[in-house]
């Protein structure tokens, strides 16, 4: 099957509802961060693809091995349309879509990104619309160390090499093993901090090795492995600016956004 022509995920971010509100030459801070992440992965040979914000349960849940009774499938957590389609809840569904366009490719490096949506009460750490970018690599030589190394190199690029990141395992339905990378929460020394919830660290990156079932669903051939690395842009920006809240980056106030650009 021919693939769609690659496009920059930052283009999709500029079309997000909050992405064009700053008048004049200023650029939205989320767009700036997206372009920086895009540039980082481009230097590593990843190709960016545009993907839809309107998804289906097949790519969002079923093919990723999300159990039928998982809370994220509930309308209490996900925005559903009357026809059963839904607003994208994470970018891994987009990764799956792009990989399935060229089944059987032994080696690939792709990048997707854009707005994601979840039903929640907006707060310092969780909001109804947020932005993710996710890179996936496929190849016989690809493995978990590559995904971890790429994650740490990305944080070096975005935050400097003194970010103090820690690595821990994380259970996700579609990866095994899975991991995440946390960074120290700078704003308030943890006591009463609304970004880290008093834990002292904030999760910025998650990823892992796709399970055999997910790899087959994505069209990854036998002998190749697929990994993914996803980063939260608003959380990344909050750490970069020393804020204990991601909501300022979704503000409709152009003056407040200009100060964060």
Question: Where are these predicted regions, by residue range?
Answer:
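TRNA-recognition modules of translation machinery and tRNA-sensing kinases, especially anticodon-binding
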Residues: 2-261
